[in-house]
Curated annotation (Swiss-Prot):
Annotated function: This soluble electron transfer copper protein is required for the inactivation of copper-containing nitrite reductase in the presence of oxygen.
Protein name from the UniProt record: Pseudoazurin
Pfam families: Copper-bind
Residues where Cu cation binds: H40, C78, H81, M86
Record key words, sorted: Copper, Electron transport, Metal-binding, Periplasm, Transport
Cofactor details (free text): Binds 1 copper ion per subunit.
Gene Ontology molecular function, alphabetical: copper ion binding; electron transfer activity
Location(s) in or outside the cell: Periplasm
Gene3D superfamilies per record: Cupredoxins - blue copper proteins (2.60.40.420)
């Protein structure tokens, strides 16, 4: 399956957001990050990646297609707006093994608040 995530200056949950911020996917799915508004990118939060998955970082203003291959949680951030809480989460498969890592990863306060809200949707 293919999923779309828009990178926005303003969305339903406030300023500087990925929308949707939480996606449920299966191994092999593609997540398309679309720079709907300018000045955004998508970068892996290296503490929130399944084992064996390489980090990734897109260029500002460019679309990026992430193919999720391994089960677990994939945390993403917008590099320039991480401090403003621009984070997203992709859950691949069930019962992610790296949930603890996602819950304890150090990040700016606003990013942590939004990540916690996204983690509340994990099942």
């Amino acid at each position: 399956a293919t999923h779309e995530v828009h990178m926005l200056n303003k969305g339903e949950s406030g300023a500087m957001v990925f929308e949707p911020a939480f996606i449920r996917a299966e191994p092999g799915d593609v997540i398309n990050f679309i720079p709907t508004d300018k000045s955004h990118n998508v970068e892996a939060i290296k503490e929130i990646l399944p084992e064996g998955v390489e980090t990734f970082k897109s260029k500002i203003n460019e679309a990026y297609a992430l193919t999720v291959t391994e089960p677990g949680l994939y945390g993403v951030k917008c590099t320039p707006h991480f401090g403003m809480g621009m984070v997203g989460l992709v859950q691949v498969g069930d019962a992610p093994e790296n949930l603890d890592a996602a819950q304890t990863a150090k990040m700016p306060k606003k990013a942590r608040e939004r990540m916690d809200a996204e983690l509340a949707q994990v099942n």
